[in-house]
C-alpha cells in the first residue's frame, strides 16, 4: 500500500515552520543590506556638492519593491546602523554619520513606500497602462521621500541655509531620480513572486 506523506510530516513541517520563516526573512534582509551596500558604491562625485549621484536610491527602490516594505525597511535600517558604527558600507567604502547620512536614513522611507507600491501593483485590477502609471507615481513618491531626512541632515551637518541645502542636495538629482523611479517600476511585479 502506498501512502502519501501527510502535511504534518517532518519535511512538511519544516517548510511551514515559523523558525524557518524567520531564518528566511533574516537571510533576505541581509541580502537586501548587501545589495544596498554594493549598488550604493556606484557613484558619480559632483564638484559643487558633497552629495554624489548615487545608485543607492535605486537600490533602495529595488530592495523595497522586491522584498516588501518590512524586509526592505529592515535592510535599510541595518545599513544605517552599520554605517553609524563606522562599518565601511557607504559610498567609497566609508562609514560614519557623514554629511550624506540623512540620505541613508531616507532609504528606510524609500523601501517602505516602494514595498507598498509593489503591494498596490499586485492588487491593482486596472489596465496595464493604469498599473504602470500608478507604479511610476508611487516610485516617484518613494524616491522623493529620501529628501526629507537627507536635506535636514545636510543642512545641519554643513550649517547651510535651506536654499543652499536645496541647491546642493536636491536640484542636481531630480532628473536622475525620475529616471531611476521609472526603471525601478519594472521591479514591482517581482514582489508577487517573493512572498
For the regions a language model picked out, list residue spans one by one.
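Residue-level signature of transmembrane alpha-helical entry/exit and packing/kink sites
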Residues: 21-29, 53-60, 72, 99, ...
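Interfacial aromatic-anchored transmembrane helix boundaries in multi-pass membrane proteins
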Residues: 41-52, 80-111
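Helix-loop junctions at the membrane-solvent interface of multi-pass transporters
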Residues: 38, 42, 66, 85, ...
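Structural signal for the C-terminal ends of transmembrane alpha-helices
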Residues: 66-70, 113-122, 190-194
Amino acid at each position: 500500500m502506498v501512502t502519501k506523506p501527510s502535511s504534518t510530516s517532518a519535511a512538511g513541517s519544516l517548510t511551514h515552520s515559523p523558525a524557518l520563516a524567520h531564518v528566511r526573512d533574516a537571510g533576505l534582509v541581509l541580502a537586501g543590506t548587501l545589495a544596498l551596500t554594493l549598488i550604493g558604491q556606484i557613484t558619480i562625485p559632483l564638484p559643487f556638492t558633497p552629495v554624489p549621484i548615487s545608485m543607492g536610491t535605486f537600490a533602495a527602490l529595488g530592495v523595497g519593491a522586491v522584498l516588501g516594505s518590512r524586509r526592505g525597511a529592515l535592510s535599510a535600517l541595518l545599513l544605517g546602523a552599520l554605517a553609524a558604527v563606522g562599518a565601511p558600507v557607504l559610498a567609497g567604502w566609508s562609514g560614519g554619520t557623514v554629511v550624506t547620512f540623512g540620505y541613508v536614513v531616507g532609504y528606510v522611507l524609500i523601501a517602505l513606500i516602494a514595498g507598498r507600491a509593489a503591494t498596490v501593483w499586485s492588487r491593482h485590477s486596472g489596465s496595464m497602462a493604469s498599473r504602470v502609471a500608478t507604479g511610476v507615481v508611487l516610485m516617484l513618491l518613494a524616491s522623493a521621500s529620501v529628501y526629507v531626512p537627507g536635506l535636514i541632515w545636510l543642512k545641519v551637518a554643513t550649517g547651510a541655509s535651506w536654499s543652499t541645502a536645496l541647491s546642493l542636495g536636491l536640484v542636481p538629482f531630480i532628473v536622475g531620480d525620475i529616471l531611476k523611479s521609472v526603471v525601478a517600476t519594472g521591479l514591482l511585479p517581482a514582489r508577487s513572486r517573493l512572498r
